[in-house]
Amino acid sequence: MGFYNSPRIILDNLVLNLDAGNTKSYAGDVSSPAGTPYGYFTGGIVPGSPSESSISQRIDYDSDTTTTSPKGPLSASRRMHSGTGSNSYGYLAGQLPNNTNADRIDYSNDTATATSKASVLVDEANRRGAVGNNSYGYWSGGTPNTTKISRLDYSNDSGGGVLKGYLTQTRMGLAGTGNASYGYFGGGMSRTTMDRVDYSNDTPTASPKGPLTGQRYGVGAAGNANYGYWAAGYPENTIGTTIDRLDYASDTDTCLSKGNLTESKYWVTATGNQSYGYWAGGREQHDPGQSDFSYTSKIERIDYSNDTATASPKGPLAVVVREVGAVSSRANAIPTAGSPSTRSVTQTNGTPYGYWMGGANPDKS
């Protein structure tokens, strides 16, 4: 406790105004968390349906054992798409049917239909990977084969995307994750390597990194500020439960194998926050030659602080889907600290009196 420019008192960072004529006093600034504690799984193919869907399902990170909540929907049906975004909006792009548009989810109003944004990608492709920071989103790879990297400036998301650099090789069915400085595109059909985009210098060709412990496509990726995780994927029954971890501080090393998912699957998606990654959707894998390719509603959570353990089942999804996209305001180590806001508190005033006590009588001196 301390006194600063009386009549104010600073107590545990709370500023109290002792002016008896002011019943509302300044109570200091407080920073509210940026973004929302949710992840969104969007679109995909529903069992029994021959085409894409526009559904959006939200998982609450603070209550992740409950069934996902219906939100959205997207402005159009889509599958085989990928997402990234800021702490205000999530963007989904690169899909079937092929086009260059994206859907934007407003995290502060997620019951509304997503807003369509034109020409976010510089070329048409599906099965892309996506990654980004709080300012820009990057999409690359996919089929038809392309190495172009599209960048969207979130502050001008009606202006369309621009071409930025290239991957070192074509990739189909890849996944991306990263931190505030770098984005990593990993996997893809017949690919074990990764490509790293430097956000501070994003026009050169991406840098080869990794590799993963094995080839995989239809993979999902998520991570925090220090590590990226790639899990699930194809080939059948050889890679579908494996979790690979990339250490960003040593990103030329081969990924380390960590825990496992509880079931083998591919065409999954993933998102998360600083503590956990969530893998959702997909198609369960079976023995070669088996024709029953069932979908899964299970959401699997990787605990980054204990990543050698088997993933924990969460959710489930309210609607079973595969080939879905995912976004979250907590993904890719996006900052969670918001702008400071001013608080005030009501104080109880004293009485309008003053008192003098003690002292010496001058007649007695």
Model-derived features: where do they sit?
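Polar, enzyme-active/binding microenvironments
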Residues: 1-365
